[in-house]
Each structure stands twice: as C-alpha cells, then as structure tokens.
A protein has these predicted regions:
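Histidine-rich, glycine-flanked metal-binding segment
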Residues: 1-48
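Divalent metal-coordination and catalytic microenvironments
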Residues: 8, 22, 27, 44, ...
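Divalent metal-dependent hydrolysis catalytic cores, especially in the metallo-beta-lactamase
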Residues: 57, 73-102, 117-130, 157-169, ...
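Charged helix-capping and loop-helix junction motifs
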Residues: 68-71, 102-105, 146-148, 223-228
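Conserved phosphate-binding/catalytic loop of the ribokinase/pfkB sugar-kinase fold
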Residues: 130-155
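Active-site core of metal-dependent hydrolases
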Residues: 151, 155-247
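Positively charged, low-complexity/disordered segments
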Residues: 246-261
C-alpha cells in the first residue's frame, strides 16, 4: 500500500525543502520528491522526523521517579503530543532502593511497550556526583563509584540502562567509564567540579559528552577552561533547551561544530 504526505516545508538531513512530499510504501519512506506542479493540497505546514528525547525527568504533572503504575504511560503520551517518537526516562539522585525500583519500572515498560512515544531504556542521572555543582541533587545521597554496584544497576534494569551521568573527578571514575562503555552504556559528565584535565581524561576513557553544558559544572575561565572549555573543544559535549543557557552562549557552542549555526 502506498500513500503520500505533502508539506509546505519538509525537513531532511540536508535541511528544509519547500513544497515536497513523502511517498510511503508499506510503512517505509520510498521517496522524498517535489510536489507535482498544480497540486495545491498540503497535509502539513511542516513535516519532520519525530524527535528522540534522551533526557526526560517528567512532565504532564508526573515524574519518572513516581511509584505509580501509569506514570510512564502518561509521560509517553505527553511526549508523543510534543512530537517525540522515542525517549529515555531519567532518574535522579535518591536512595539506592528507590533508584532500583524506578529502573525496574522503566525496564518493564520498555519491554512490554504501550501507548505514546517508545521507551528506549533508562538514563541514570545520579547518585555519582560531587557537591560543588549539585543542582537539585541531594548531596547526602551521593555515592562512590564501585564496579559491582554499577553491574547491579545494569542487572536491575534488565540491561535497558542506556546512559549513566557521573562526575569525572570522583575516585574510580575513569575505571567506571571504561567498564560502562564495555557494557554498551553511554557515559555523560556533569554535576561536577572537574578541571579541564580531568574532563579530557574522562573523554579519553570513553565518556560521550557533558550533560547540560554550562550548567552544573566548572565554568570557562581564561586561565582554567574547566569542564565548559573541555566541552567547547569536543563536539559531543553539549546540549541545551535554551532556557538554562542563553542563546548567545548556545550559538557559541554551535559555531564550534555545526554548519547550520
């Protein structure tokens, strides 16, 4: 079965295309092509791929950490209404048993599926941070990095744990990063007072980037570039919602690496 979706503007990896259509055959995009001359009907003003939201704590009045059976379904529907096709429910620093329970719920939802945006797995943000840039994370619940504990978290998640955020200056951080990467878990750096050197060492060990660049980390100084400086020299290391970081600062990030800034 073939059908066509026509849009005034259509987003592709090459940028926006005006007055183009998708030709879809058996659920697969078969062609991206100009709308024939004389066809005035448009199915959408703007047409683009669904987003993948890799860091979601909550929304629609609920939180990923809430111990209720319908929380993840509510969030999945909320994300779908925002144009998100898949997402990573993200935990926060909490007692270890509370984190385990959240990871178990996410794993079950990931495996059984359900309405709304697809759950791709879990994102562990905390408790492996340091107090100087703790943000909303309670420092009394921070923990040291131990390989056995990380393996337990992976097991509890039924191997659906996709990302772990940690502070790279913590004892054992580099070993933990290498181990997590061997387990196919991505590592982000944040809520940290790490130096430029410590951050670069973490990247060299396999860390994938910074979690909320500029926020929750050592700032940029002309004599000590800090985590922000390390991030600005590595294209993997930033993301922003333009609320916690000014647009001009975000433009600085983009100008380092993106042809579309």
């Amino acid at each position: 079965m073939t059908h066509v979706l026509r849009a005034r503007r259509l987003l592709t990896e090459e940028g926006w295309l005006d007055d183009h259509q998708l030709r879809i055959a058996d659920g697969v995009i078969a062609a991206i092509e100009p709308i024939p001359v004389g066809v005035t009907e448009r199915d959408a003003e703007l047409l683009c791929p669904a987003y993948i939201d890799t860091h979601v704590h909550g929304g629609a009045g609920v939180d990923v950490m809430d111990d209720a059976p319908d929380v993840l379904d509510k969030l999945a529907m909320h994300k779908a209404r925002e144009g998100v096709g898949s997402w990573l429910p993200t935990t926060v620093t909490a007692p270890l048993n509370t984190i385990h329970a959240a990871l178990e719920r996410i794993a079950q939802r990931c495996q059984r599926g359900g309405p709304g945006a697809q759950v791709l797995g879990s994102y562990l943000e905390g408790p492996y941070f340091t107090p100087q840039n703790k943000g909303a994370h309670p420092p009394e619940l921070f923990r040291e990095l131990e390989i056995a504990e990380l393996d337990q978290l992976i097991a509890v998640s039924q191997h659906t744990l996709r990302v772990v955020a940690l502070a790279p200056e913590k004892e054992g951080a580099l070993q933990a990063i290498r181990h997590l990467k061997q387990q196919n878990v991505r590592v982000m750096l944040g809520h940290s007072a790490a130096t430029w050197q410590q951050t670069r060492a973490a990247f060299d060990a396999g860390a994938d980037g910074l979690v909320h660049c500029y926020n929750g980390m050592t700032g940029l100084h002309h004599r000590e570039p800090g985590m922000v400086g390390a991030g600005l020299t590595d294209k993997r290391a930033w993301r922003s919602d333009e609320r916690r970081v000014g647009k001009e600062c975000l433009r600085l990030c983009r100008s380092r690496w993106s042809p579309y800034h």
